[in-house]
């Protein structure tokens, strides 16, 4: 089989986020063995990162004129596979492929049905970012089950090489860090409640520790997040918060590595566990608790609550934190979670799954 020429339309509403990170990592993995990748997107930061992998980039205005560009791309036909990401991007792919008649694989990153039942017969396969989304696409999108496979989020291999810091090391200076990492928008507001629940429990369990909430990310509700955390800091005297804004992707795992607890979901959840942080999974559709035991199973299944989970009730956050207040229990929980993720969601493993799903050499 010859190397493939892959057209990758990508469209998201945020300047940077999990979908961007996923597709840039994917491009890197595809280019390395010799596949040709051409992004279609709005430019900006994602273009810079995509081109750094060796991929080409075609800039498109998603608000106007994209359909004409898609038709032109289809007429040129300089690809043998379309790998689309997010609804507007799959529309681009469908328009281009109506002319080109090549293979088309659609990646599903979130729980939106996108009227899949109206167009699923026009694409060759679906890959979904969690087992929860596989179920969603088959059941609610009404896509033929054989067409759908799981291609999960991953953590970079190098993140697993960060040293595992113990419970005592993370608190040795009298300061404990609680990291959140996400776009600051409406669908992420449940994380505030989870942070509040956790920090209340930690303040009581460790009254002599000063707890700092490190908020990584930005977005339309930045002021709301800031206000809520400021109110919490005023109420609990040993709690403060810092709004870091967007942090470089490679620096986020280091912050998580030093954190006693990370409250997040999605790709950031994978990075939290890989980095050696205790993680409280809170996503757009569910809270799946402190990531140990059955909570960890539900977290991996649902992308840490971002994609929804059915017939599941997490264990008590305060109860779990109390049980993990001993150094040995905390250290074991962190070590087990990292090992589980390394065996199923390290970047190298997921890269192989992607090459297989796209039928690349």
Where are these regions (language model features)?
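N-terminal strand-loop element at the rim of the active site
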Residues: 9-63, 219-225
């Amino acid at each position: 089989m010859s190397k493939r020429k892959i057209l990758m339309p990508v469209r998201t509403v945020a300047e940077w986020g999990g979908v961007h990170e996923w597709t840039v990592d994917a491009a890197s993995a595809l280019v390395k063995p010799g596949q040709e990748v051409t992004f279609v997107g709005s430019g900006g930061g994602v273009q810079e990162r995509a081109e750094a992998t060796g991929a080409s980039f075609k800039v498109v205005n998603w608000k106007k004129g994209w359909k004409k560009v898609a038709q032109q791309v289809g007429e040129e036909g300089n690809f043998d596979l379309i790998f689309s990401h997010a609804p507007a991007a799959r529309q681009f792919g469908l328009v281009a492929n109506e002319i080109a008649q090549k293979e088309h694989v659609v990646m599903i990153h979130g729980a939106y049905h996108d009227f899949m039942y109206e167009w699923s017969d026009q694409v060759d396969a679906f890959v979904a970012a969690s087992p929860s989304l596989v179920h969603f696409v088959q059941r609610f999108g009404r896509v033929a089950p054989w067409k759908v496979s799981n291609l999960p989020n991953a953590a970079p291999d190098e993140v697993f090489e960060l040293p595992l810091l113990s419970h005592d090391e993370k608190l040795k200076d009298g300061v404990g860090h609680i990291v959140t990492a996400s776009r600051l928008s409406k669908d992420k507001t449940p994380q505030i409640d989870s942070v509040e629940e956790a920090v209340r429990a930690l303040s009581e369990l460790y009254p002599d520790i000063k707890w700092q909430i490190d908020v990584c990310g930005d977005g339309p509700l930045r002021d709301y997040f800031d206000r809520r955390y400021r109110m919490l800091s005023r109420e609990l005297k040993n709690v403060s918060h810092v709004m870091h804004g967007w942090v470089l992707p490679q620096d986020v795992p280091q912050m998580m590595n030093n954190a006693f607890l990370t409250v997040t979901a999605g790709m950031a959840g994978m990075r939290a566990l890989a980095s050696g942080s205790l993680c409280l999974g809170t996503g757009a559709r569910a809270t799946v608790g402190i990531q140990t035991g059955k909570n960890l199973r539900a977290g991996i299944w649902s992308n840490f609550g971002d994609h929804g989970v059915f017939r599941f009730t997490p264990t008590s956050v305060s109860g779990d934190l109390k049980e993990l207040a001993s150094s040995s229990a905390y250290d074991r929980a962190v070590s087990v979670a990292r090992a589980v993720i390394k065996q199923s969601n390290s970047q190298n493993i997921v890269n192989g799954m992607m090459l297989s799903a796209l039928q690349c050499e």
